[in-house]
Curated annotation (Swiss-Prot):
Membrane-traversing stretches: none
Active site: E90 (proton donor), E121
Protein name: N-acetylmuramic acid 6-phosphate etherase
Residue span(s) of domain SIS: 62-225
Source species of the chain: Actinobacillus pleuropneumoniae serotype 3 (strain JL03)
UniProt keyword Transcription, yes or no: no
InterPro entries referenced in this protein's UniProt entry, alphabetically: Etherase_MurQ, Glucokinase_regulatory_CS, MURQ/GCKR, SIS_dom, SIS_dom_sf
Entry EC no(s): 4.2.1.126
Additional record remark: A lyase-type mechanism (elimination/hydration) is suggested for the cleavage of the lactyl ether bond of MurNAc 6-phosphate, with the formation of an alpha,beta-unsaturated aldehyde intermediate with (E)-stereochemistry, followed by the syn addition of water to give product.
Annotated Gene3D superfamilies: 1.10.8.1080, Glucose-6-phosphate isomerase like protein, domain 1
SS bond partners: none
Amino acid sequence: MSEKNLLTALSKMITEQRNPNSMNIDQLSALELVKVINQEDKQVPLAVEKCLAQIAQAVEKIVQAFQNGGRLVYIGAGTSGRLGVLDASECPPTYGVSSEMVVGIIAGGERALRHPIEGAEDNTEQGKADLQAVNFSQKDVLVGIAASGRTPYVIGALEYAKSLGATTVSIASNPNSAMAQIAEIAIDTIVGPEVLTGSSRMKSGTAQKLVLNMLTTASMVMIGKCYSNLMVNVQASNEKLKARAIKIVMEATECDRTVAENTLKIAENNAKLAIMMILSDSDKTTAEQLLAAHHGKLRQALAK
């Protein structure tokens, strides 16, 4: 796209418009300024609320993919890419899943997490190549993230995923975007112009984070990675998480600390297994068999 055409396209995007509520921010006190930002931020969850049907549809597709051995793959550039990598990286410690189950890809690779990579988002072919590098297949779900809805790198990835017959989801903050035209499910969080014109790391980025939270949390809950609202699959990899595992077992079973610690020791710090052992009054092997028979879903295993 020529510079003139790009300028024309950007001028039509909501995310690139000037916000009438922040025209004088360079004249405000610190308190006045953060009040303006806070007031604008209040619009974000309301914009996300309007997309709940599409978000739920995406969750159902992700759950189906997980159950069939597929993965959830996020792809984006800049802030959008970083948020995808962030959400993906939180899944293993929170839900005890493989780091391959939810994958985050950012234009420009690992270095782009901390430093801007010139031109990385403009390469359509690289989006496709980066999916090929992680062996993306029809079984996987691709979520393309870009506030503008027009990032070439993400469009290239979405087009490739679609050509394979994989489920494609777009997250953008402009309506009727190029990404939305490609994706099977379009999540358009229309948060309005940013406080700082064009700075989509602000409201648009916050909306993206809320949506990503929903996608992984709801999907993991639906495949049995929690019990009630407890993170029973937590990986107790540090002192804080070991203490959390003890607390989770105590809350789920109403046992005392000693019982929780002793059972966790037998269960090799597996909180879900420890809970199963206590609530079913069974040994480790029997508890493991019960969980396996119900695909790791603790509530279902306990009901039998």
